[in-house]
Amino acid sequence: MTPLGRLHLLRVLSTPPVFLLGLLLALPLGAQGLSGVRFSASRTAHQPPQKHLTHGLLKPAAHLVGYPSKQNSLLWRANTDRAFLRHGFSLNNNSLLIPTSGLYFVYSQVVFSGESCSPRAIPTPIYLAHEVQLFSSQYPFHVPLLSAQKSVYPGLQGPWVRSMYQGAVFLLSKGDQLSTHTDGISHLHFSPSTVFFGAFAL
């Protein structure tokens, strides 16, 4: 007659695998050596996403304010009022130096003003123009990027004012230079909000 202990061992070994799987699933997680699994999964599911600060997202930008010079020309400044140079831009010989290649929005505004014409004087037109130019190693001369012109006929009605604003997107290369040329400088109405010039990377 087979001992009782051996019979019990034979029954366990002959138990179908499906039954053993069901028995394992019915055991507590601690008995399976999986304690904390449910807590860890829950914590991961409700954990707020971490914010990663990516360096190098600060893009070049420049804003210049116009001032008159002794040579009757338009002088740009970056260290006064609301003017600035950021993240690679520099001002050299009254020109903006492009720090990196890419797309840039270039803009400029000028405001002209003048007095009315004397009743005895013969009205003559005043030519006003403002242009943003590109100087690059790819071209042997200054290339116009933005250009605007106006003619004013001073009358007897009183002082006159004319404004010009220009802006567009350009593909520029590192080392390119942006400058301006203005006709009618003696009529420029200088202030930080009326005469300015700048660019920023997109």
From Swiss-Prot:
Q: Which Pfam families match?
A: TNF (PF00229)
**One term of GO molecular function:** cytokine activity
The subcellular localization recorded is: Secreted; Membrane
Keyword set for this entry?
Cytokine, Glycoprotein, Membrane, Secreted, Signal
InterPro entries associated with the record: TNF, TNF_beta, TNF_CS, TNF_dom, Tumour_necrosis_fac-like_dom
How does the record describe its quaternary structure? Homotrimer, and heterotrimer of either two LTB and one LTA subunits or (less prevalent) two LTA and one LTB subunits. Interacts with TNFRSF14.
Question: What's the name of the protein?
Answer: Lymphotoxin-alpha
